[in-house]
Amino acid sequence: MDFPDEWTQKEFMQNKIKLEKEGVKVVLVDTILSPIEKAETTTYNPHEFKNYPDGTVLVFYCDSGKATLDRLKEYKERFPQHHCVSLKGGRGYWRKNMMLLDEDVL
């Protein structure tokens, strides 16, 4: 799979389901110490990421998505064994009650 620089919330949810069925770990990474309600997140911890399997997808988020997109090159250099993506719109655009319908799943 070719990974773009950004995923929307819907793309994140779709790709998480698809990739985890294929055995690929997908992690939503909190860079602002502010978890997203009703979402499984992990706090940014570079030492912990070293323990993740190679090929893990790290989806970084901040308040607006701008800071993580600006730092994406740095994340990709720091974690070359993983795929790094920024969450478009960040925490501010996350819809806590958004659900995927069967036809939405890739």
Residue ranges: model-predicted function:
Residues 1-38, 106:
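Flexible, polar/low-complexity N-terminal or interdomain linker segments that lie immediately upstream
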Residues 98-106:
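Active-site neighborhoods of enzymes that stabilize oxyanions during catalysis
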